Amino acid sequence: MESAPKTVSLPVSPLGYVYARQKASLQTGTVSLTAARSVDSDLAVLPVIRGLTVEQTFTTNVAVVAGSKTTGLGGTGITLKLTPSHFNPSAFVFYGGSVIGASSNAPNLTRACEAARRRFGFSAFSSPPVENAVETSGEEICASLNLSPETTALYLVVTESFKEMVYVCNTFLHYGGTSTVTIDGQDAMKIPIYPVQLYMPDVNRLASEPFNAKHRSIGDEFVYSRPFFNSDLCRLLHGYVLGPAAVALRVRNLDGVARGAAHLALDENHEGSVLPQDVTFTLFDSTQGNAGKGSGRAQRQGDGSGSKNSASSGIERRLASVMAADTALSVDSIMGAGIYDTELPSVEDWPVLSSGDDTESLEALGAYAARLSGLVGAMVFSANSVLYMTEVDDGGPADGKDGSNPSYHRFYLIAAPYVAGNPQTDKDGRVLPHTADQQAAPINGSNQEFSLDYLALACGFCPQILARLLFYLERCDAGTFGGRNETDALRYLANTLESDVPCGLCNQATRPACAHTTLHRLRQRLPRFGAPVRAPIGIFGTMNSAYSDCDVLGNYASYGALKRPNDNEAPKSIMQDTYRATMERLVNELEQAKLIDKETLAQASPCSAPTSVVHDQASFIGLLSNIKDTIEGAAEQFMRTLVEARDFKIREGLADANHTMSISLDPYSSSFCPVTSFLARRTVFAVLQDLVLSQCHCLFYGQSVEGRNFRNQFQPVLRRRFLDMLNGGFITAKTVTVTVSDSGVLAPDLTRPASEPPTKDYDGDMARVSMEVLRDLRVKNRVLFSNGGANMSEAARARVAGMASAYRRPDKGSNILNGAVGFLVKQYHGVLFPRGHPPGIDTPNPQWFWTLLQRNQMPARLLSKEDIETITAIKRFSDEYSAINFINLTPNNIGELAQFYFANLVLKYCDHSQYFINGLTAIVVGSRRPRDPAAVLAWIDRTINGAADVEPAAQEVLQRLGSNPAAWTGTFTSTNMVRYVMDQRPMVVIGLSISKYNGSAGNNRVFQAGNWNGLNGGKNVCPLMAFDRTRRFVLACPRVGFTCEAGGFGTGVRENTLSEQVRGIVSEGGPMVQTAVFAAVLHALGARTQHLAVDDWIGLVDDEFLAASLDALNATVVDQFGEWSVEAAQELVKNMEAQTTAGAVAAGEGAFDFGACVGDTPQQSTSAFNGGLAMAAAPAGQKRSLPDDILFDMGAPPEKKSGLTFDML
C-alpha cells in the first residue's frame, strides 16, 4: 500500500565538509573498532556517527547548493540551484589517519589489491582525474586553519549525490565559511565544500577543466577559487566509492563511473546513458550459445537461425549488461537524492557503550563487532552472494509455444569472478589487442580455486574494505569442522614459517597475520563456483521496522484480511482477532503461567522451562496437560471467532498466507561500519540490475539492436520501465515534496575570495520539488507448498514435481527425543527418571533410556508405576502431536512448541494434508572469547622464533585475551521464533529470488515478488544450516539493545563434512549417542577437540542438552587422567563404549512393551483434535465427544494402525 505524499522542509547546506580535529580528541578505541583501515596506509574510512565523527546537531537531510543560474532582466541576477540529498554514511580520513588502529595486521593489502586490479583489467588511480590539477595538501589545510599538521586529522563528510564531484575536482574549499563545532566535548573545525559550478551560471554539467581560471563559463564579476584536489582523498574515494560500484556495474574504467555519477548529480533531468561508449566486456561462452547446456534453447534464437544469430545474441547480452548498469547508476542517483526518516545514529544512544567504564564498553563493542563476523562471513562464504555477481548471462528465449514472446528471465546476473581475468571485448565482441594474451577461464568454473584476488575483486580493490573484511574473517571460527589435517592453521604456519611462500605479501614476521594464512585456515568454507545458472542471490540488509509476519503461519488472518469494506469498526477491535494478536495473547498466557520468559525468545537461547515448574513426575504430567489445554483452548476460540464472528474464509486465507519481512533501503540503518555500508550498497546494485535485466528482452524484442544509436535512444525507455515497477510488490517507494526551511541561502560571496565570510543575500530555487524515495525491499515466503496450477509451464511443472517429494510428509510414528517434547524430556530426565542411566555410570542419560524403551529392550523390573504413567503421558502427547504435525521443525522450547502446536491445530481445522508447510529458522550470531590457538594466529604480536614457537605464541595470545577488547570470535545459535528475532530490527543475510509477472488480463504492468530463498554453500556458510527445501533460513545480528533502542538452497557442492557425519550419528540414535559423537569428533579434530566450547558442540549436534553432555566429557578427561590428551580422551571413549549395551534386557527376561504403554489408540487420540471446538473439554488423554453443532465438517480422521512402533535405526 502506497503511503500518502509528505512534505519535508530541508535546511540549505554545502555539498560536504572537511573536518579538522585534534588526534587526541578522537575516541581511538571506539573509532578503531568501527573503522576500516589497512596497516600499510594512513587512509581510513569511518562511520558517520553523531558524537563520534560529527557533532550531535548534525543534519543528514539537506538542500545542497549545487549551482547557480541567471535571473532577472538581462540575466544580471544570480539564484542558487538547490538539490535535495542526504549525507553519505561514511567519512573519509585522508590526513592523520595513523592514529586510528588498523582493522587487520595483514601486510601489504594495497599491493594485493593493485595486483588483482591489474589481473582483472580495472583502471588504477595513478594521476589526477583532471588536467593541470594543483594539489591541496593536508598540511596546507592545517596551515589555513592555524592548526599543527602533526596533531591534526582531516576527514571528508560528503552528501551522497556529490561524492563523485569531489573526486573529479569540481569542488572548492570555502575557508571563509569555516565554523567550530563540538564533538565528544572537544572543539573541531569544519570547512564547507561547494561545487565550482557556482561560478558557472546556467551550467548543469561537469567542468572538464576545473583548474582553468579563465574558462569562458565563469562569470566575469566572479573571483574564481582554486578547485579542491587532494591526491590521498581522491585515492580513497577511488577505492571505496568507485571501485565497488565499477565491479558491481562491470565497468572497468572507474573514471567513467565517476563522471557519469557526477553528471547525474548536476543534471537532475538527464534520462539517457552516462557511462562511456567504449565500455569493455569480459569474454566468456554464454549459456545461450553453449551447446550441451540443456535442451534446444541453448542455441536457439527468436528466428531459429544459426551462427549469425548467435553473434546477435552476444551483442544483446553485452548491450543488456551495459544498459542495466547505466540504469542502475541512474537509479542510484535517485536514491542519493532521497530523503530518509531515520536519524543519524548517535554514539550516546548506543546501549552497547553504556555497559560500564571505558574498558567494559570497548569489550562490549568488540564483542558486538565479532557478532557481525557471522553475517559478513556468510556473504564471503556463499557462492551466490552479491559480492560475486560480476557478469550477465543470456539464458536464451523461452521454450514452448510462447517462446517467441519477450521473456522477463532471459538475462540475469551470475556469480563468475573466475572469468574476470579473461580477455576483454568491445560491444561487437572483438577482443581488445592488449588483452588477447590473457588466459581465458571456462565459464563452468572448472579448476578454479578461490584466491585472495577474488576477495580483492569483491572489495572493489579497496585495501580499506579488504582490511575490514579480514577483520571479520579473522573472527570466523564457529563451524570450521572440516577435520582435515592440511587445513590446520598451526601446522601450516609452522611448516611455512622458515620457507618462502609465493604470496608476495608477507615475511616470517608478518606471516601469522597474512591474508593468505587467514584464507588457508578458512579454505574449506570458501565458495566453490560451478556452471552459471539463474539462481537466488545472497543479500545483506537491515530490518529497520519492528513489524514482520514471521510467525509460523505468517500473515494468516491479518488485519487487512479481516477488515470488511466500508466497515466502521475500530481498528483495535479488528486487531484483537488477528492471528498475530492471538499468538501474542497465547505467549502472554504462557508467561503468566511461568512457563516461558518472553525476553529470552529473541535471544536464541535455550529458553528452557523454569526448574521450579517441574519437581517430580506428577508435576511434569501436569505441565504437559497445562500446555495442551492452553493451546487447544486458544486455537478453538481463534477459529470460532474467525468463522462465526468474522466470516473469514479460513481455507482460502491459508492458501494466501505468506511470511513477510522488509529490508530497509535507508543508508543509516546499515552504517555500523564501512563494510556493512558497502555490503548494503552492493546489495542495492544487484537488486536494481536484476529488475532492469528483466526488462531488457522486452526492450530488444523486434528492434535492430545493432544500430549505433540504439543505446542512446532506448536508455530512457529502460529507465522509465524500471520506475514503473516501483510499488509493484517488491520495492516500495513514497512521494516526497521538499521545501527550503531557510528564508535566505547562506553561500560564498562569489565576487570575493574564498577566504571571505559567506553571505545570505542569495535566493534559492529547488531543482527537485517532488521525488520518489525508495524505502524498502519486501521479502515474502509462501506458508503452504503449492504443487502446481493449470497455467504452469512444463518446466515449472517439472520443477514443482521434483520438490513435491521433499514436502510430502512421511507416514511414520513419533520419536520421543526428537519429537514435540523431546527438549523437556532431556531437560528434566534427571528429575523424572533419576535411575535412567547405564549401569556403572552415575549421570542420567536420556539417549540411553529412551533408546532402550523404544526398542523394547528396557527391563520392566526397572520401571515403577509412576515411571510407566510418566512414559505413557509423554508418549500420548508425542503421538497426538505427531498425528497432526505438518511442520518439519522440532520444537526446542515451550514457546516454539506453543507456536507449532497452535499452527498445526489451525492446519487441521483447514483440512490441510499431505505436505509440510514452509518453516522459518533464524540463525542468530553471537560472540565469545576464542579457545583454539589456531583462531588467534592473526593477533600474534611478537616475533616467532622457529616452527616450535608457533603454538606457544598463540597460547600467549589466549592468556592475554582480557587486555584485547577486539579479541572475540563469532558463534551461531538458532531459533524458530523468528518474529521475535525480527523485532530486534537486526542486520540480516538471506537468499532472495525476484519473480516478475504481469497482472490480470489487459494489465501490462510488471509486478514482482521478492521470494525468500537460500544461500549456496550450506554448512560452509553456517554450520546450523541444513539442506531442506521445507525450511527458510535467515542469519540475523540484533541491533536493539546494542546500537539502537527498542522501538532454499542452490546447487552448491555438498561434502561429507564432520558436521554431516555427526548429524547422521545423532539421527541414528542409540543408547550412547554422545560417546559416538565424541569419538567421531576426536578422530577428525584430534587435539583441537579440547578447545571446543558448548557453542561449537551445538553447531555440530544442534541439540543444547547433548552439547552440554559432550562439553562435560572434556572435563571428565581431565578429572580422570589429570590432563587432557588425545590418548586420554580415547581411553575414556573406550571405557564408555564398553558400557554401551549394559542394562539392556537379558535373554529370557521380561521387557517393557513401549508400544503398548498408551491407553488410547491412535485413532482415539487424533479424534480429540477433531472435537476441538466442543464446548466442554474432556480430561487429558481421553476421547472427546463430538458436539452436534460443530462449526464445520472436519471429515473422518485418518486411519492408523493400532500399534505404533518406533525404530531409531
Curated annotation (Swiss-Prot):
A single BP term in Gene Ontology: DNA replication
InterPro entries membership: DBP_sf, Viral_ssDBP_head, Viral_ssDNA-bd
GO cellular component, one term: host cell nucleus
Gene Ontology MF, one: zinc ion binding
UniProt-annotated stretches for the region Required for nuclear localization: 1182-1209
Motif range (Required for filament formation): 849-850
Zinc finger (unnamed): 503-516
Compartment(s) where it occurs, according to its Swiss-Prot or TrEMBL record: Host nucleus
Primary residence: host cell
Region described as Disordered: spans on this chain: 290-312
This protein's record includes keyword Nucleotide-binding: no
Annotated keywords: DNA replication, DNA-binding, Host nucleus, Metal-binding, Zinc, Zinc-finger
Pfam families attached to this UniProt entry: Viral_DNA_bp
HAMAP family xref list: HSV_DNBI
Subunit note: Homooligomers. Forms double-helical filaments necessary for the formation of replication compartments within the host nucleus. Interacts with the origin-binding protein. Interacts with the helicase primase complex; this interaction stimulates primer synthesis activity of the helicase-primase complex. Interacts with the DNA polymerase. Interacts with the alkaline exonuclease; this interaction increases its nuclease processivity.
Record's function text: Plays several crucial roles in viral infection. Participates in the opening of the viral DNA origin to initiate replication by interacting with the origin-binding protein. May disrupt loops, hairpins and other secondary structures present on ssDNA to reduce and eliminate pausing of viral DNA polymerase at specific sites during elongation. Promotes viral DNA recombination by performing strand-transfer, characterized by the ability to transfer a DNA strand from a linear duplex to a complementary single-stranded DNA circle. Can also catalyze the renaturation of complementary single strands.
Protein family membership: Belongs to the herpesviridae major DNA-binding protein family.
UniProt protein name: Major DNA-binding protein
Organism, scientific name: Equine herpesvirus 1 (strain V592)
